[in-house]
């Protein structure tokens, strides 16, 4: 098989038994069919193949090297992955459990829509919605969730909401939980409701008795505060109060489900949370609670389904990962010794934000796009000479295989894997969107590579730009736009031009997402970048413009910018008056969260041997205990 033919995720890669239900199996087979991006027999000139003779480019030219650690995942290990949860019996069992959970939802209301229990019925319905979402199984219950939220929303007032429809007053726990869920589902709710939970001095307070209910209420208040919009001062105050209260509570709380929930939200706030990691964590928490306590029947049913769904998707993950490995291997990517090989980590990220079996095309397109970005990143950042990079940039603008004639040998293979893969993914996008979208992607790619060339020229000349000059270019070189645009176009969700304008450049949504990634990435990478001779970063440019400022000053300033941008991005994602519905922006927003997650503690993209490795193990390699 040709070194530059993409290995298709054909029907044989994923059997019926890997799908969580019979209904989804047919849909997934259609999605898998679209991944056949090339056919056996496709070939290219030998000069475009990547081999050890050209990929290392031992040509005597002095080159900068990134000094990154090698691929962490052995070929034999990836090929050996297997799971018993591919058996069709597991999918059948999941279908039965889904039906039983739907009955639980339906038990909260009767035929005419009136709720059956007046004491805590509203809280119970919100609890059900919150739990299926945190457990990663909410896609099965969209109709039931809509019915439940419509019921509860009827009782929302300017002061919030109480536990039940007969509640004489509102309470913080139900209001905070309801506010968060309603906002995330596009209902109009005002944060002013939280003003009614302040004391006479206008401060949030808690009683001296730290009951579990009070701690739970403050915990949900903290979660609600994380989806704040700009200028919502009451949520800023709520976040500060709740964070201080919960940190103090952790000092006295015994190790319990609640304490572990608090720690998780502190570690992974809304803007850097991966739904699959949250599902794994919450499954473990509920499982421990069932051992130490006496769980109700509803919790046990939810937990059983969540575990089963996690493991069924885990089986599908392994098949998709093995197909990606074959694509990566047969393109000759391992021979590019100067780049970071992170296809496993990128797959972990994308399968952490999208667990819908039918979206295999999206997941694989994201990984391939990100791997191409990594090749370009390392080539422009370190390995390529300035003259070589100018030639490559011009060749990308031509977008023709004949453009490789003027390129160095190692660049020819890079160019062809880029050219062929982008074109093939554009064909898949055309099937989904019903129109040619290659023009969008090529423009995004040209802008991305152009920003890299500018940074390479800065390094070559020793030029240190102003903060704003670096920041504006850095939004493009962050890679967020190209990493998002190509994959989302392969989804079955329609993206007509007017909706794409609300997500892609030059929308505020795109600008804020790119800004966050650039700023957060720089706060984690600036020391390593400086060691490689890259003088320009948000940190260094800020210090240059603000004489006498320290690195701590620069980081505080940048972190403040990030906090403001997160609120602006929340608004662009959830605003009720937007032309693009939340469903159209969800994948782009979740990609932003996923990429932010990589930089939660450090540059988990370059240094993938710590938290990122643990993430791979928890969410891709290990099943949960049934």
From Swiss-Prot:
* Amino-acid positions noted as binding Mg(2+) 1 in the UniProt annotation, renumbered to this chain: 377, 381
Job of this protein: Monoterpene synthase (TPS) involved in the biosynthesis of monoterpene natural products included in conifer oleoresin secretions and volatile emissions; these compounds contribute to biotic and abiotic stress defense against herbivores and pathogens. Catalyzes the conversion of (2E)-geranyl diphosphate (GPP) to (+)-3-carene and, to a lower extent, to terpinolene.
- Got a GO cellular component term for this one? chloroplast
Q: Which PANTHER family match?
A: OS04G0344100 PROTEIN-RELATED (PTHR31225)
Q: State where Mg(2+) 2 binds.
A: 377, 381
What is the annotated localization of this protein?
Answer: Plastid, Chloroplast
Task: Quote the cofactor binding remark.
Answer: Binds 3 Mg(2+) or Mn(2+) ions per subunit.
- The residue numbers the entry assigns to motif DDXXD motif are 377-381
Enumerate the cofactors the protein uses. Mg(2+); Mn(2+)
Residues binding Mg(2+) 3 are: 529
Superkingdom of the organism of origin: Eukaryota
Catalytic reactions of this protein: (2E)-geranyl diphosphate = (+)-car-3-ene + diphosphate; (2E)-geranyl diphosphate = terpinolene + diphosphate
UniProt cross-references to SUPFAM superfamilies, sorted A to Z:
Terpenoid cyclases/Protein prenyltransferases, Terpenoid synthases
InterPro entries, alphabetized: Isoprenoid_synthase_dom_sf, Terpene_cyclase-like_1_C, Terpene_cyclase_plant_C1, Terpene_synth_N, Terpene_synth_N_sf, Terpene_synthase-like, Terpene_synthase_metal-bd, Terpenoid_cyclase/PrenylTrfase
**What are the protein's GO molecular function terms?**
magnesium ion binding; terpene synthase activity
Named in its record, the pathway it takes part in is: Terpene metabolism; oleoresin biosynthesis; Secondary metabolite biosynthesis; terpenoid biosynthesis
**UniProtKB keywords:** Chloroplast, Lyase, Magnesium, Metal-binding, Plastid, Transit peptide
Write down what this protein is called.
Answer: (+)-3-carene synthase 1, chloroplastic
Comment, domains = The Asp-Asp-Xaa-Xaa-Asp/Glu (DDXXD/E) motif is important for the catalytic activity, presumably through binding to Mg(2+).
Pfam families tied to this protein: Terpene_synth, Terpene_synth_C
Q: Gene symbol?
A: TPS-(+)3car1
Gene3D superfamilies to which the protein is assigned, alphabetical: Farnesyl Diphosphate Synthase (1.10.600.10), Terpene synthase, N-terminal domain (1.50.10.130)
- EC number of the protein: 4.2.3.107, 4.2.3.113
Q: Give the family per the record.
A: Belongs to the terpene synthase family. Tpsd subfamily.
The transit peptide spans 1-45
Which GO biological process annotations does it have?
diterpenoid biosynthetic process; green leaf volatile biosynthetic process; terpenoid biosynthetic process
Origin species:
Pinus banksiana (Jack pine)
């Amino acid at each position: 098989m040709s070194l530059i033919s993409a290995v298709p995720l054909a029907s044989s890669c994923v059997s019926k038994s890997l799908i969580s239900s019979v209904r989804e199996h047919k849909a997934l087979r259609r999605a898998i069919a679209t991944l056949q991006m090339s056919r056996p027999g496709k070939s290219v000139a030998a000069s475009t193949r990547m081999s050890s003779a050209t990929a290392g480019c031992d040509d005597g030219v002095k080159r900068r090297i990134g000094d990154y650690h090698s691929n962490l995942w052995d070929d034999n290990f990836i090929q050996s992955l297997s799971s018993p949860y591919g058996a069709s019996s597991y999918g059948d069992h999941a279908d039965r459990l889904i039906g039983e959970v739907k009955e639980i939802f339906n038990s909260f209301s009767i035929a005419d829509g009136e709720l059956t229990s007046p004491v805590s019925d509203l809280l119970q319905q919100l609890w059900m919605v919150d739990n299926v979402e945190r457990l990663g199984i909410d896609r099965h219950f969209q109709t039931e969730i809509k019915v439940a939220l419509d019921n509860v929303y009827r009782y929302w007032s300017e002061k919030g909401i109480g536990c039940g429809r007969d509640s004489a007053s509102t309470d913080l726990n139900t209001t905070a939980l309801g506010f968060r869920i309603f906002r995330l589902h596009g209902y109009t709710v005002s944060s002013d409701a939280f003003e009614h939970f302040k004391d006479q001095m206008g401060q949030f307070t808690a009683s001296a008795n730290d009951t579990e209910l009070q701690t739970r209420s403050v915990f949900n208040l903290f979660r609600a505060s994380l989806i704040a919009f700009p200028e919502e001062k009451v949520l800023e105050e709520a976040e500060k109060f709740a964070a201080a209260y919960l940190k103090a509570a952790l000092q006295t709380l015994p190790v319990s489900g609640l304490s572990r929930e608090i720690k998780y939200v502190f570690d992974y706030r809304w803007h850097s949370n991966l739904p699959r990691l949250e599902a794994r964590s919450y499954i473990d928490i509920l499982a421990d609670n069932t051992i130490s306590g006496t769980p109700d029947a509803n919790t046990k049913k939810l937990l059983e389904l969540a575990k089963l769904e996690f493991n069924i998707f885990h089986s599908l993950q392994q098949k998709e990962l093995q197909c990606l490995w074959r694509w990566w291997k047969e393109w000759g990517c391992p021979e590019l010794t100067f780049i970071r090989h992170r296809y496993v980590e990128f797959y972990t990220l994308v399968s952490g934000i999208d667990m819908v079996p039918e979206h295999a095309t999206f997941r694989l397109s994201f990984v391939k796009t990100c791997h191409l970005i990594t090749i370009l990143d390392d080539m422009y950042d370190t390995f390529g000479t300035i003259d070589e990079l100018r030639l490559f940039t011009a060749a990308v603008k031509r977008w023709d295989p004949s453009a490789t004639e003027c390129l160095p040998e190692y660049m020819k293979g890079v160019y062809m894997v880029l050219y062929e893969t982008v074109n093939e993914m554009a064909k898949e996008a055309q099937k989904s969107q019903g129109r040619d979208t290659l023009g969008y992607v090529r423009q995004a790619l040209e802008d991305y590579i152009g920003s890299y060339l500018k940074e390479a020229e800065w390094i070559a000349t020793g030029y240190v730009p102003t903060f704003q000059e670096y920041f504006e270019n850095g939004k493009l070189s962050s890679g967020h736009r190209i990493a998002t645009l190509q994959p989302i176009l392969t989804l079955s969700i329609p993206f007509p031009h007017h909706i794409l304008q609300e997500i892609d450049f030059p929308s505020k949504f795109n600008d804020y997402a790119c800004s966050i990634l650039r700023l957060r990435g720089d706060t984690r990478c600036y020391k390593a970048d400086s060691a490689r001779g890259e003088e320009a970063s948000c940190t260094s440019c800020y210090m240059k413009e603000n004489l006498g400022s320290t690195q701590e000053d620069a980081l505080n300033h940048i972190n403040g910018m990030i906090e403001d941008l997160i609120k602006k991005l929340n608004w662009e994602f959830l605003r009720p008056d937007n032309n693009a519905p939340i469903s159209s922006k969800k994948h782009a927003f979740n990609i932003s969260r996923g990429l932010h997650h990589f930089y939660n503690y450090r540059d988990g993209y370059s240094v993938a041997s710590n938290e990122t490795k643990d993430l791979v193990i928890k969410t891709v390699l290990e099943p949960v205990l049934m």
